[in-house]
Structure formats: C-alpha cells, structure tokens
C-alpha cells in the first residue's frame, strides 16, 4: 500500500518488446534506425533502417513481462524485493568515471565493491578489475616508454645526419671524378686538334 511504480517496458507473450510513444495495446511495424530501442541492429550499414514489429506501450493482459521501477516506497516492505539488501557489485571499473567520488591521489582499490564470502568450498572475496588505474608502476612504465621513444628519436636523428654526411662526401667524390675525366677528355681533344691546325 502506498507504492508508486513507473513502467519501464515489457514484452508480450510472443516476445515482442514494448516501445515508448506507441500508444496502442497491439503490435505495429515501424521503420527503425540502428541503435533505437527495440532494434539493436548489429551488422547493419550506416543509416540503414529496418521494419520491425514492436508492441505499444499501453498495458493489457497479453503481456508476459512488465518491467517496473519503484518511484515511491509505501508503508510495508514487499517480501523478496524491498526487505532484503543486495550488494551493489557493478561499480565503475574506470577511475575516470568515478572522479567525483575520489581524489586522483587516492587509492581507488579500497573503494571497489566486492562480493561477500562464499559459504561453500572457497572462502574469499571477488572484486572487478579496475581499468586504467594510475599506480606508481604504471607511471614508471610511462616514463620508461617516453625515455625509450626519445632515445629512438635521437638515434634516428644521428643516423640520418651520418647518412647525409656520407651522401655529401660520395657526391663530392663523384663530382671530382667527373671533373677529372672531363679535364682529361678536353686535354686529349686539344692535343688531337693541334697537329691538324699546324698542318
């Protein structure tokens, strides 16, 4: 008594989902884009639409599942629903998502949701892996990565400078050889042309 629920969705007996904004108690076929409710559309092309059967959002007896959310709690507890407290396991796995909860210097691992101990063979606690956690080890790896990159850039620059120097010396040698050969050729031609002039 006193509970207020909000209808969030549901399915009829054939498994067709309810769609918000379709004000009919039956089924309709709508052209839906990928990613819209009632059409996940994996493997579709960009902008492709498909005609899918969806059920209207009006509640009727032909529904098999109705999803509700408690908006306002009533006087008494509902057995199995509001009288038991279930642990919240699905916390944020990325520290960036939960920066409002912690400071950057804090160790986020202390605040991670963990499961309760098992009463069967194995006793312990399970915790989700935190992605992109900034620890001293990750910072050390980042520094090492940056230092390695700088070292590689410096090595590449020095090798490029050496190569340019070698290339310049080779080009200079080629020019000298060519000028020598041209000088020899000219001297031969001039030597060959002198007797003919004298004659």
Curated annotation (Swiss-Prot):
Q: Does the keyword Mitochondrion apply?
A: no
Report the record's Gene Ontology biological process terms: translation
User: What is the annotated signal peptide range for this record?
Assistant: none
- Protein name, per record: Small ribosomal subunit protein eS6
Functional summary from the UniProt entry: Component of the 40S small ribosomal subunit. Plays an important role in controlling cell growth and proliferation through the selective translation of particular classes of mRNA.
Q: Per the record, which residues fall in region Disordered?
A: 172-199
The UniProt entry's sequence similarity note says: Belongs to the eukaryotic ribosomal protein eS6 family.
Q: What is the lineage of its organism?
A: Eukaryota, Viridiplantae, Streptophyta, Embryophyta, Tracheophyta
In this chain, composition skew of type Basic and acidic residues spans 172-183
Which GO terms fall under molecular function for this chain's record? structural constituent of ribosome
- Give the free-text PTM comment from the record: Ribosomal protein S6 is the major substrate of protein kinases in eukaryote ribosomes.
| UniProt GO cellular component terms | ribonucleoprotein complex; ribosome
Keywords per UniProt: Phosphoprotein, Ribonucleoprotein, Ribosomal protein
Q: Does the keyword Cytoplasm apply?
A: no
- What Pfam families is this protein classified in? Ribosomal_S6e
